[in-house]
Protein backbone atom coordinates (compact mmCIF):
# COMPACT_ATOMS: atom_id res chain seq x y z
CA UNK A 1 0.00 0.00 0.00
CA UNK A 2 1.25 3.47 -0.90
CA UNK A 3 1.18 6.04 1.90
CA UNK A 4 2.52 9.47 2.79
CA UNK A 5 4.05 10.31 6.17
CA UNK A 6 3.53 13.85 7.46
CA UNK A 7 5.36 14.89 10.64
CA UNK A 8 3.91 17.91 12.48
CA UNK A 9 6.56 19.95 14.27
CA UNK A 10 6.32 23.04 16.50
CA UNK A 11 8.97 24.66 18.66
CA UNK A 12 6.63 25.26 21.61
CA UNK A 13 7.46 22.90 24.48
CA UNK A 14 7.19 23.69 28.18
CA UNK A 15 9.68 21.06 29.34
CA UNK A 16 12.06 20.98 26.37
CA UNK A 17 12.38 24.31 24.54
CA UNK A 18 13.30 23.96 20.84
CA UNK A 19 12.80 20.19 21.09
CA UNK A 20 12.53 19.49 17.32
CA UNK A 21 15.96 21.09 16.85
CA UNK A 22 17.69 19.25 19.71
CA UNK A 23 20.96 17.78 18.49
CA UNK A 24 21.03 13.98 18.20
CA UNK A 25 24.40 12.79 16.98
CA UNK A 26 24.93 15.80 14.73
CA UNK A 27 21.42 16.09 13.33
CA UNK A 28 18.26 17.81 14.64
CA UNK A 29 15.65 15.54 16.21
CA UNK A 30 13.09 16.34 13.50
CA UNK A 31 15.54 15.13 10.85
CA UNK A 32 16.14 11.89 12.78
CA UNK A 33 12.38 11.31 12.93
CA UNK A 34 12.07 11.90 9.18
CA UNK A 35 14.93 9.49 8.48
CA UNK A 36 13.20 6.74 10.46
CA UNK A 37 9.95 7.41 8.62
CA UNK A 38 11.77 7.14 5.29
CA UNK A 39 12.69 3.56 6.20
CA UNK A 40 8.99 2.62 6.43
CA UNK A 41 8.50 2.41 2.68
CA UNK A 42 6.48 5.63 2.55
CA UNK A 43 6.05 7.16 -0.89
CA UNK A 44 7.03 10.50 0.62
CA UNK A 45 7.89 11.96 4.02
CA UNK A 46 7.10 15.62 4.71
CA UNK A 47 7.63 17.76 7.81
CA UNK A 48 4.77 20.19 8.53
CA UNK A 49 5.83 23.25 10.51
CA UNK A 50 4.96 26.86 11.20
CA UNK A 51 8.48 27.88 12.25
CA UNK A 52 11.27 29.18 10.02
CA UNK A 53 14.05 27.51 12.05
CA UNK A 54 12.53 24.05 11.63
CA UNK A 55 11.96 24.77 7.95
CA UNK A 56 15.61 25.78 7.52
CA UNK A 57 16.91 22.71 9.37
CA UNK A 58 14.90 20.41 7.11
CA UNK A 59 16.10 22.17 3.96
CA UNK A 60 19.70 21.94 5.18
CA UNK A 61 19.37 18.17 5.62
CA UNK A 62 17.37 17.67 2.40
CA UNK A 63 14.16 16.68 4.19
CA UNK A 64 10.92 17.67 2.46
CA UNK A 65 9.14 20.36 4.45
CA UNK A 66 5.99 22.46 4.12
CA UNK A 67 5.15 25.67 5.96
CA UNK A 68 1.68 25.81 7.54
CA UNK A 69 -0.50 28.30 9.33
CA UNK A 70 0.43 29.00 12.94
CA UNK A 71 -3.09 28.82 14.37
CA UNK A 72 -3.75 25.07 14.19
CA UNK A 73 -5.20 23.66 17.45
CA UNK A 74 -3.62 20.22 16.89
CA UNK A 75 -1.09 18.32 14.84
CA UNK A 76 -3.95 16.59 13.03
CA UNK A 77 -5.21 19.93 11.71
CA UNK A 78 -1.67 20.78 10.63
CA UNK A 79 -1.17 17.59 8.60
CA UNK A 80 -4.62 18.01 7.06
CA UNK A 81 -3.52 21.40 5.74
CA UNK A 82 -0.36 19.93 4.24
CA UNK A 83 -2.21 17.02 2.64
CA UNK A 84 -4.48 19.57 0.96
CA UNK A 85 -1.61 21.88 -0.04
CA UNK A 86 0.30 19.11 -1.83
CA UNK A 87 -2.84 17.91 -3.58
CA UNK A 88 -3.20 14.41 -2.18
CA UNK A 89 -6.28 12.64 -3.58
CA UNK A 90 -9.16 11.59 -1.34
CA UNK A 91 -8.11 7.93 -1.40
CA UNK A 92 -4.51 8.64 -0.33
CA UNK A 93 -3.33 7.23 3.01
CA UNK A 94 -1.63 9.71 5.33
CA UNK A 95 0.31 8.68 8.45
CA UNK A 96 0.84 11.16 11.29
CA UNK A 97 4.21 10.47 12.94
CA UNK A 98 4.96 12.57 16.01
CA UNK A 99 7.98 14.85 15.74
CA UNK A 100 9.49 13.66 19.03
CA UNK A 101 9.80 9.97 18.07
CA UNK A 102 13.38 9.66 16.73
CA UNK A 103 13.48 5.92 17.51
CA UNK A 104 10.08 4.96 16.08
CA UNK A 105 9.98 1.53 14.45
CA UNK A 106 9.57 2.01 10.67
CA UNK A 107 7.71 -1.31 10.39
CA UNK A 108 5.09 -0.03 12.87
CA UNK A 109 4.39 2.92 10.58
CA UNK A 110 3.86 0.62 7.59
CA UNK A 111 1.72 -1.88 9.53
CA UNK A 112 -0.60 0.86 10.77
CA UNK A 113 -0.99 2.32 7.28
CA UNK A 114 -2.06 -1.05 5.85
CA UNK A 115 -5.13 -1.14 8.12
CA UNK A 116 -6.83 1.66 6.20
CA UNK A 117 -9.64 0.28 4.04
CA UNK A 118 -12.83 1.39 2.32
CA UNK A 119 -14.77 0.93 5.57
CA UNK A 120 -12.10 2.05 8.03
CA UNK A 121 -10.73 5.57 7.41
CA UNK A 122 -8.50 5.76 10.48
CA UNK A 123 -6.01 3.45 12.19
CA UNK A 124 -3.65 3.48 15.14
CA UNK A 125 -1.50 1.05 17.16
CA UNK A 126 -1.18 -0.56 20.59
CA UNK A 127 0.84 -3.13 22.51
CA UNK A 128 0.23 -5.34 25.55
CA UNK A 129 1.06 -3.83 28.93
CA UNK A 130 3.50 -5.92 30.95
CA UNK A 131 4.04 -3.75 34.05
CA UNK A 132 1.35 -3.38 36.70
CA UNK A 133 2.37 0.25 37.31
CA UNK A 134 1.33 1.12 33.75
CA UNK A 135 -2.08 -0.47 34.27
CA UNK A 136 -2.99 2.13 36.91
CA UNK A 137 -1.04 5.08 35.46
CA UNK A 138 -3.42 7.70 34.00
CA UNK A 139 -0.62 8.92 31.72
CA UNK A 140 -0.65 5.51 30.02
CA UNK A 141 -3.64 5.53 27.67
CA UNK A 142 -5.40 2.18 27.29
CA UNK A 143 -7.56 0.92 24.45
CA UNK A 144 -10.04 -1.96 24.26
CA UNK A 145 -10.91 -3.63 20.97
CA UNK A 146 -13.84 -5.47 19.43
CA UNK A 147 -13.48 -8.88 17.77
CA UNK A 148 -12.50 -7.20 14.48
CA UNK A 149 -9.59 -5.34 16.03
CA UNK A 150 -11.35 -1.99 16.04
CA UNK A 151 -11.27 0.39 19.00
CA UNK A 152 -14.22 0.32 21.36
CA UNK A 153 -12.83 2.97 23.69
CA UNK A 154 -9.66 4.77 24.77
CA UNK A 155 -9.17 5.79 28.39
CA UNK A 156 -6.69 6.91 30.99
CA UNK A 157 -8.55 4.63 33.39
CA UNK A 158 -7.81 0.94 33.83
CA UNK A 159 -9.78 -0.78 31.06
CA UNK A 160 -10.92 -3.44 30.91
CA UNK A 161 -11.21 -3.83 34.69
CA UNK A 162 -10.36 -7.35 35.85
CA UNK A 163 -13.00 -7.58 38.57
CA UNK A 164 -12.00 -10.92 40.09
CA UNK A 165 -8.25 -10.52 39.62
CA UNK A 166 -8.02 -7.07 41.20
CA UNK A 167 -10.30 -8.17 44.03
CA UNK A 168 -7.47 -10.52 45.02
CA UNK A 169 -4.51 -8.21 44.39
CA UNK A 170 -3.54 -5.03 42.58
CA UNK A 171 0.18 -5.72 42.91
CA UNK A 172 0.54 -7.88 39.80
CA UNK A 173 -1.14 -8.34 36.43
CA UNK A 174 -3.74 -11.14 36.80
CA UNK A 175 -3.27 -14.30 34.76
CA UNK A 176 -4.90 -14.10 31.36
CA UNK A 177 -5.27 -10.32 31.57
CA UNK A 178 -3.68 -8.40 28.69
CA UNK A 179 -4.61 -4.71 28.72
CA UNK A 180 -3.39 -2.70 25.73
CA UNK A 181 -1.41 0.53 25.80
CA UNK A 182 -2.26 2.93 23.02
CA UNK A 183 0.59 4.13 20.79
CA UNK A 184 0.17 7.67 19.48
CA UNK A 185 0.61 6.87 15.80
CA UNK A 186 -2.27 7.52 13.38
CA UNK A 187 -3.10 6.74 9.76
CA UNK A 188 -5.98 8.31 7.84
CA UNK A 189 -7.73 8.10 4.53
CA UNK A 190 -7.22 11.64 3.23
CA UNK A 191 -10.93 12.21 2.57
CA UNK A 192 -11.60 11.65 6.29
CA UNK A 193 -8.52 13.64 7.32
CA UNK A 194 -9.95 16.66 5.51
CA UNK A 195 -13.28 16.21 7.34
CA UNK A 196 -11.64 15.76 10.75
CA UNK A 197 -11.09 19.46 11.61
CA UNK A 198 -14.83 20.07 11.18
CA UNK A 199 -15.89 17.36 13.66
CA UNK A 200 -17.33 18.84 16.83
CA UNK A 201 -15.47 18.22 20.08
CA UNK A 202 -17.04 15.44 22.14
CA UNK A 203 -17.77 15.44 25.90
CA UNK A 204 -15.72 12.27 26.33
CA UNK A 205 -12.73 13.86 24.62
CA UNK A 206 -12.95 16.79 27.01
CA UNK A 207 -13.22 14.55 30.08
CA UNK A 208 -10.30 12.29 29.19
CA UNK A 209 -8.24 14.85 27.23
CA UNK A 210 -7.93 12.31 24.41
CA UNK A 211 -8.48 13.71 20.93
CA UNK A 212 -9.11 10.31 19.33
CA UNK A 213 -12.35 9.94 21.31
CA UNK A 214 -13.84 12.59 19.02
CA UNK A 215 -13.65 10.08 16.16
CA UNK A 216 -15.43 7.29 18.06
CA UNK A 217 -18.03 9.77 19.34
CA UNK A 218 -18.96 10.54 15.75
CA UNK A 219 -19.29 6.84 14.92
CA UNK A 220 -16.16 6.54 12.81
CA UNK A 221 -14.30 3.21 13.21
CA UNK A 222 -10.62 3.12 14.17
CA UNK A 223 -8.62 -0.02 13.34
CA UNK A 224 -5.83 -0.92 15.77
CA UNK A 225 -2.59 -2.72 14.93
CA UNK A 226 -1.37 -4.66 17.98
CA UNK A 227 2.39 -4.97 17.89
CA UNK A 228 4.23 -7.57 20.00
CA UNK A 229 7.10 -5.12 20.46
CA UNK A 230 6.85 -2.37 23.05
CA UNK A 231 7.88 0.84 21.25
CA UNK A 232 10.64 3.08 22.52
CA UNK A 233 9.01 6.06 24.17
CA UNK A 234 9.27 9.52 22.65
CA UNK A 235 11.21 12.49 23.98
CA UNK A 236 9.17 14.39 26.58
CA UNK A 237 11.69 15.15 29.33
CA UNK A 238 15.39 16.06 29.67
CA UNK A 239 15.98 12.48 30.82
CA UNK A 240 14.38 11.14 27.63
CA UNK A 241 16.60 13.44 25.57
CA UNK A 242 19.73 12.20 27.31
CA UNK A 243 18.73 8.57 26.73
CA UNK A 244 18.17 9.16 23.02
CA UNK A 245 21.43 11.08 22.70
CA UNK A 246 23.27 8.10 24.14
CA UNK A 247 21.68 5.90 21.47
CA UNK A 248 22.84 8.13 18.62
CA UNK A 249 26.31 8.47 20.16
CA UNK A 250 26.92 4.73 19.80
Swiss-Prot record:
One of its GO terms (biological process) is lipopolysaccharide biosynthetic process. Its main location: cytoplasm. Pathway: Nucleotide-sugar biosynthesis; CMP-3-deoxy-D-manno-octulosonate biosynthesis; CMP-3-deoxy-D-manno-octulosonate from 3-deoxy-D-manno-octulosonate and CTP: step 1/1; Bacterial outer membrane biogenesis; lipopolysaccharide biosynthesis. It catalyses: 3-deoxy-alpha-D-manno-oct-2-ulosonate + CTP = CMP-3-deoxy-beta-D-manno-octulosonate + diphosphate. Disulfide bonds: none annotated. GO terms for molecular function: 3-deoxy-manno-octulosonate cytidylyltransferase activity. Keywords: Cytoplasm, Lipopolysaccharide biosynthesis, Nucleotidyltransferase, Transferase. GO terms for cellular component: cytosol. InterPro entries: Cytidylyl_trans, KdsB, Nucleotide-diphossugar_trans. Its EC number is 2.7.7.38. Pfam families: CTP_transf_3 (PF02348). It is found in: Cytoplasm. It comes from the Bacteria. PANTHER family: 3-DEOXY-MANNO-OCTULOSONATE CYTIDYLYLTRANSFERASE (PTHR42866), 3-DEOXY-MANNO-OCTULOSONATE CYTIDYLYLTRANSFERASE, MITOCHONDRIAL (PTHR42866:SF2). Belongs to the KdsB family. HAMAP family: KdsB. Activates KDO (a required 8-carbon sugar) for incorporation into bacterial lipopolysaccharide in Gram-negative bacteria. This is 3-deoxy-manno-octulosonate cytidylyltransferase. It comes from Janthinobacterium sp. (strain Marseille).
